[in-house]
A protein has these predicted regions:
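N-proximal low-complexity "stem/linker" segments adjacent to membrane-targeting elements
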Residues: 88-141
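A short, glycine-/small-residue-rich helix N-cap motif at loop->alpha-helix starts
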Residues: 182-188
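Catalytic-site signature of metal-activated, phosphate-bearing donor transferases
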Residues: 188-190, 215-380
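Short acidic donor-binding/metal-coordinating loop in glycosyltransferase active sites
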Residues: 156, 181-182, 208-209, 217
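Short beta-strand-to-loop acidic/aromatic patch adjacent to the donor-nucleotide binding site
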Residues: 201-214
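Charge-rich, low-complexity intrinsically disordered regions
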Residues: 1-111
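Acidic donor-binding segment of Leloir-type glycosyltransferases
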Residues: 141-179
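Active-site nucleotide-sugar/metal-binding loop of Leloir-type enzymes
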Residues: 191-203
Length: 380
């Protein structure tokens, strides 16, 4: 199946492949079969049009999964809006960056303090969600208390009571829920938010509903960002939490229930998510990585340049992104099952994903539980 798939893809060029990799011609294998069995593992490109290194560097989950890049692109990447080469990426960037003159004028007029012009939000948040009602109120309350003024939630066919759970935030104009049906909509949703909000917010945070960004100290996120305004983005490292020995979904808040994390040097902790200045961002390429406009770049908490979706080391002395990937074992099982419906590739339960061998205690999020619970109960 995969052999026929890549032959029909338009990105496997048999003559080009044989000309550039003579060992394939002498292998006794059909060119496509050689690429699938041996070539891609050696870093061979299927054609000039499909850039092997670009694809793996831009979408690190492909490398982690050990999947042939071209097969991944045809089975999953294409419908997710992934790019097979840098040329197509930059073509999309050009199309994305044509904001209307009126929006630009309003933004800069507000920045100058001209009368009668609504001031843009300082910090907004965009996320795509599906069936997150049991957790979403805690998450929204947490970020609202930490300086997020406006939430743009892309609802990917939720079947729960999302709008009811957030009704007070919606009525107050703090949360806007945007219908976003279909599969593989994460990156398209982020780019829609980038286009919508380029001149409506100073900063745009792009995170998932299981991620909580925490400043170490007394500052809100919005206050912490003041020192980074000359940069295109602040890239924040993950801190990965496991199930903490909980087999069933517990009572209480996510912030207080989970207290064990991967050790500092685990590669999962090297991934970043970013708070971006949307006027300096050309395109969201994947959930962990944006392309920036002419000379602009992201930095970490120490003002060190960050290139790509991962960092060389985890840096979380000032700010971190707690990632409650699995929660309890019961919830992890349900998450794996949900993932199957949105992917050609089979995801299975792996003990190392929910019970970390290198787990250490970490409870920095606990201090937020009281204020968050209070806001959840009283509302806005």
């Amino acid at each position: 199946d995969d052999e026929r798939l890549i032959e029909k893809s338009g990105y496997f060029r048999e003559k080009w492949y044989l000309r550039n990799y003579p060992e394939a011609a002498g292998s006794g294998l059909a060119p496509a079969r050689h690429y699938l069995q041996e070539g891609w593992k050696k870093g061979f490109r299927p054609s000039m049009q499909f850039d092997y290194e670009f694809y793996l560097n831009t979408y690190p989950e492909v490398n982690e999964a050990g999947i042939c890049p071209l097969v991944h692109y045809e089975r999953e990447g294409r419908r997710k809006g992934y790019f097979p080469n840098a040329r197509q990426l930059y073509k999309s960037i050009w199309k994305q960056n044509r904001a209307g003159f009126a929006d630009r004028l309003k933004f800069w007029a507000a920045k100058l303090g001209l009368p009668g012009v609504k001031k843009p939000a300082y910090l907004s948040l965009a996320a795509i969600i599906k069936n997150e009602a049991p957790y979403i109120r805690e998450w929204v309350c947490f970020y609202y208390l930490n300086g997020v003024e406006k939430f743009y939630l892309y609802d990917n066919e939720s079947e729960d009571n999302l709008r009811e759970v957030l009704s007070d935030f919606v009525s107050a104009g703090i949360v806007e829920i945007i219908n976003c049906p279909g599969k593989a909509k994460q990156v398209p949703a982020y780019n829609d938010a980038l286009s919508r909000l380029r001149y409506k917010t100073q900063w745009l945070m792009i995170v998932d509903a299981d991620e909580f960004m925490i400043v170490n100290g007394n500052k809100k996120i919005s206050e912490f960002l003041k020192d980074y305004e000359k940069y295109a983005a602040l890239a924040v490292n993950w801190v990965m939490y496991d199930y903490g020995g909980l087999l069933k979904k517990p009572e209480g808040l996510v912030l207080e229930n989970y207290r064990t994390v991967h050790g500092k040097f685990h590669p999962k902790n090297l991934h970043v998510k970013s708070v971006i200045n949307p006027r300096k961002v050309a395109l969201c390429v994947n959930p962990h990585y944006c392309e920036y406009k002419g000379g602009n770049y992201a930095v970490n908490e120490n003002f060190e340049k960050v290139v790509g979706p991962v960092t060389a080391v985890q840096s979380i002395d000032k700010i971190r992104l707690n990632h409650y990937y699995c929660k309890s074992y019961e919830e992890y099982e349900a998450k794996v099952a949900r993932g199957l419906a949105d992917s050609y590739f089979k995801y299975t339960i792996k003990k190392e994903d929910y019970a970390f061998d290198d787990a250490t205690e970490d409870y920095v999020a606990g201090r937020f539980a009281g204020p968050v619970r209070s806001l959840m109960e009283k509302g806005v």
